[in-house]
Regions:
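Canonical positions in the second alpha-helix
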Residues: 1-2, 35-36, 69-71
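TPR alpha-solenoid repeat register
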Residues: 11-12, 46, 80-81
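Structural motif corresponding to the intra-repeat A-B loop/turn of tetratricopeptide repeats
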Residues: 22-23, 57, 92
């Protein structure tokens, strides 16, 4: 199965996040996360993945915009999101 043909937004985000988080191919990871967001645009996890991808690309402005909105919406109870928030907050 070609990964590009996977139609499940859950798997698209998961695969994208793995590519991003492990610095395998951040650009490609963001592409997969954006595909997932097309199907679930309000997903907290998918938006967090996208913010993390932008952070990994040193696009601090985009990362901060997304992560601040998430913090305002749901707070920082999720440990993974809090880790991302703390790192992105320091991004320059």
């Amino acid at each position: 199965i070609a990964l590009e043909s996977i139609d499940s937004h859950t798997y698209q985000n998961y695969f994208g996040y793995i590519l991003i988080d492990h610095d395998v191919d951040v650009k490609k990871g963001i592409k997969f996360v954006k595909k997932a967001l097309e199907k679930e645009p309000n997903s907290i996890a998918y938006r967090d993945s996208l913010a993390w991808g932008y952070y990994k690309q040193h696009d601090c402005k985009k990362a901060k915009t997304i992560i601040e909105k998430l913090k305002d919406e749901i707070g920082l109870e999720d440990l993974e999101m809090k880790k991302h928030y703390d790192a992105i907050k320091e991004c320059k």
